[in-house]
């Protein structure tokens, strides 16, 4: 089994019994009971499982949790949709914009859109068609979602969204070859 350390929604997590091929999606849903991250296609096509990942260099990316293995987040900060709002419950600007612009209908895809938009918001990115190209919606249509992204882009980035990179230095991680029952993973 593999031992890893990471931040989850701003909280340090140490896991010493995760299989090297365990996906972040399954870990979030099955072990942490964070079910906002959805399993849509389980192939990286729909974006319903998008999570925010900050690596030790401070690079922030929106990644598909269904394609991300747990050892790949060793030493990183992960934010699921549950960790996008301020810890006091105040919605993130993209969450407020999605509500006010009616960017959700059935809601299944909404968490992935919100996380992708929050990553773009943190980076100051404004090419929303490109940013959201990895997220699919079958009911709302994309116009209200794009309007929400545009509306949120001028809002200040909430302070808790910048805190993860500073907290990563406190994690103790080891890069190693791990093996478990014919499963191997090397974290480069």
Question: What name fits each language-model region?
Answer:
Residues 1-188:
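Signature of N-terminal electron-transfer/Fe-S-associated modules in redox systems
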């Amino acid at each position: 089994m593999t031992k890893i350390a990471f931040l989850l929604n701003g909280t340090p997590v140490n896991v010493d019994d995760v299989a090297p091929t365990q996906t972040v999606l399954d870990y979030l849903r099955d072990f942490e009971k964070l079910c906002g991250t959805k399993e849509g296609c389980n192939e990286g096509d729909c974006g319903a499982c998008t999570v925010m990942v900050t690596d030790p260099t401070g690079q922030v990316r929106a990644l598909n949790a269904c394609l991300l293995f747990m050892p790949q987040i060793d030493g990183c900060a992960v934010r699921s949709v549950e960790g996008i709002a301020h810890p006091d419950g105040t919605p993130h600007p993209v969450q407020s914009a999605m509500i006010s612009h009616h960017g959700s209908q059935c809601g299944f895809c909404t968490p992935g859109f919100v996380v992708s938009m929050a990553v773009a918001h943190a980076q100051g990115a404004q090419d929303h068609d490109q940013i959201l190209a990895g997220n699919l919606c079958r009911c709302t249509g994309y116009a209200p979602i794009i309007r929400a992204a545009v509306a949120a882009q001028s809002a200040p980035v909430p302070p808790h969204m910048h805190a993860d990179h500073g907290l990563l230095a406190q994690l103790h991680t080891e890069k190693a070859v791990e093996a478990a029952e014919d499963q191997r993973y090397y974290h480069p």
